[in-house]
A protein has these predicted regions:
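Membrane-proximal, non-transmembrane interface segments of integral membrane proteins
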Residues: 1-58
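Soluble C-terminal extramembrane regulatory/interaction domains of multi-pass membrane proteins
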Residues: 43-59, 63-144
Length: 144
């Protein structure tokens, strides 16, 4: 059973499972940052969540990208979740401005990295398309 050409249900199921797990990490991050009771931090986490979900959508649209994105959907999100939990617990008790600045810098790095990975996956898909078009045009010229 094939959906999009070259993509089978096994691949789409793998992506669905990976995205489900990644969503759990995002949910845990969102729950944890609420403990910090800082609306700016909540908004900042939401911005990162949007960047992460953009990467999820890219992988869902082309499940072949899962291999290239797996580290982001698992390892990096797990680290982001763990860092958020530890930060929120510390910040709720201490209001440490340096911890807050460090955490915001981490979110900036994460958001940039996730957005870059999404762009790279999309541009790889574009490169594949450009190659296909070029090969087809060359064949058409040779036939003419």
């Amino acid at each position: 059973d094939k959906g999009a050409e070259g993509i089978d249900t096994f691949q789409t199921d793998r992506v669905a499972r990976a995205v489900d797990e990644a969503e759990k990490h995002l949910s845990a991050m969102r729950d944890a940052i609420l403990r910090a009771q800082d609306r700016q931090l909540e908004g900042r986490v939401d911005r990162f969540i949007a960047a992460a979900r953009a990467l999820f959508r890219t992988v869902e649209e082309d499940p072949r990208d899962l291999t290239a994105a797996r580290k982001y959907l698992s390892v990096y999100l797990m680290g982001a979740r763990d860092s958020t939990v530890k930060f929120a617990d510390l910040y709720a008790r201490s209001r440490d401005p340096q911890a807050r600045a460090d955490y915001l810098a981490l979110l900036d790095d994460l958001e940039t990295t996730f957005a870059d990975r999404s762009r790279r996956l999309l541009s790889d898909n574009r490169s594949d398309l450009d190659v296909e078009i070029s090969v087809l045009r060359d064949r058409l010229k040779a036939e003419a």
